[in-house]
C-alpha cells in the first residue's frame, strides 16, 4: 500500500472515530448536566463520616486543622501508625461531590465506658460544633429536614450529628436527651460490643 493511500485510510479512520465519539461526548455532557441539576435541587446526604475522630486523633483540635485545604496532603502526626491513610474529606471535595448534608459521626471506642463515655461523646459533639463555627460560609448545623433545606438554600452543607453506639450514653436516657439537644439525630444501638440492653452480635 502506497503512502498516500495509507494516509487517506488513516484520516478516514480518525474521522470515523471522531464522528462516533461526538454523540457519546454530547450524551455524557447531557447526563452530567442532569446530575448537576438534580443534586442542586435535592440535597445528597452522606450518612456517616468519621472526620471528628480523625480531627481529635490527628490534630487535637479544630484550630490545628485546615478544612478548606486538600486534607489528603496534610502531614500525618509523627506518631501515626503505618496503616493510617490520608484524610478523604474536605470542603473542596464535599463541594465537588455536591454533598448537601453530612452526618458527622461522634464515634468513640467501645473500650471507653461509663461516665467517661458520656464525657468523650460530648467532646466529639463539641468538635462538630467548632468545625461548623470555624467554616460558617460552608457549613451550617441542622437538626431537621427543614434545616437541611434552609442550609441548601443558603449554599451551605447541612451538618448533622450521629452517635455510633449505645455505650456512649452509659444507660442514661437523660444523657441521650441532652445529646439530642446538642444536635445528635441518630444513635446506633451498638457498635462492636454489647450494651446492657442490646447485643452487638460480635
Language-model features and meaning:
Residues 10-19:
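Bacterial N-terminal signal peptides
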Residues 1-5:
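N-terminal secretory signal peptides that target proteins for export/translocation
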Residues 25-202:
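N-terminal hydrophobic targeting/anchoring segments and the immediately downstream early-domain regions
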Amino acid at each position: 500500500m502506497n503512502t498516500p493511500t495509507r494516509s487517506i485510510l488513516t484520516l478516514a479512520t480518525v474521522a470515523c472515530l471522531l464522528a462516533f465519539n461526538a454523540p457519546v461526548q454530547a450524551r455524557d455532557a447531557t447526563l452530567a448536566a442532569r446530575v448537576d441539576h438534580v443534586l442542586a435541587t435535592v440535597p445528597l446526604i452522606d450518612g456517616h463520616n468519621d472526620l471528628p475522630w480523625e480531627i481529635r486523633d490527628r490534630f487535637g483540635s479544630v484550630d490545628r486543622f485546615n478544612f478548606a485545604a486538600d486534607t489528603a496532603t496534610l502531614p500525618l502526626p509523627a506518631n501515626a501508625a503505618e496503616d493510617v491513610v490520608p484524610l478523604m474529606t474536605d470542603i473542596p471535595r464535599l463541594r465537588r461531590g455536591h454533598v448537601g448534608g453530612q452526618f458527622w459521626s461522634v464515634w468513640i471506642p467501645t473500650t471507653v465506658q461509663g461516665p467517661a463515655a458520656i464525657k468523650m461523646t460530648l467532646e466529639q459533639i463539641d468538635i462538630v460544633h467548632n468545625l461548623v463555627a470555624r467554616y460558617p460560609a460552608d457549613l451550617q448545623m441542622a437538626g431537621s429536614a427543614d434545616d437541611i433545606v434552609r442550609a441548601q438554600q443558603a449554599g451551605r452543607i447541612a451538618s448533622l450529628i450521629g452517635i455510633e453506639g449505645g455505650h456512649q450514653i452509659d444507660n442514661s436516657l437523660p444523657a441521650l436527651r441532652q445529646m439530642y439537644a446538642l444536635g445528635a439525630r441518630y444513635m446506633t444501638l451498638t457498635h462492636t460490643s454489647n450494651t446492657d440492653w442490646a447485643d452487638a452480635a460480635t
